[in-house]
């Protein structure tokens, strides 16, 4: 049935959350408080306040996150989505993830709602750098400013352009597929609802129930995302 929806859709949007990344082995953000960080709340470290007032702790935390992302990579689900994009079956990927795995697998049209750990920029002048600077223990810009990941921290404004594009894509969607998101973070969790209100079929693939399951045309909770996407590819 979903294969038919995919082939019949003129505009398909994929929306991915933490569950997409954890299938690659990457711990989710909320699980980041292990080891050295066990006594810390990640949401407090990942804040503009910590960057401004406790920069060493901030850099230590994010260097570890950058190194962790570089240990892992895309799984079969990422590659299937990239292939579907090439085939014209997927028209937009909207992601809450910051690991860059969609782009690494070959997807071109990716809207990152919360930024990316693959890039850094200077907090003072805005100059962009690769995250390899953190790996090589380089934490300052040529101007002397602090290098920080190009992600949205707690206490910062959300990226208006990425969100507006995501809202526009949701309005156009015939098929909207949620992969691995609990749909509890606002305003990102409004995006699937916009698609549904504009006539899209809504599919939610997530291990745990979400607040929007009641609006979905289909929910899947007993399959891993990669297996689910592979099963669709193998249909027919």
Curated annotation (Swiss-Prot):
It is found in: Cytoplasm. It holds the Pfam family SIR2. It catalyses: N(6)-acetyl-L-lysyl-[protein] + NAD(+) + H2O = 2''-O-acetyl-ADP-D-ribose + nicotinamide + L-lysyl-[protein]. GO terms for cellular component: cytoplasm. Nicotinamide binds at residues 29, 98-99. Its main location: cytoplasm. NAD-dependent protein deacetylase which modulates the activities of several enzymes which are inactive in their acetylated form. This is NAD-dependent protein deacetylase. It comes from Oceanobacillus iheyensis (strain DSM 14371 / CIP 107618 / JCM 11309 / KCTC 3954 / HTE831). The lineage of its organism: Bacteria, Bacillati, Bacillota, Bacilli, Bacillales.
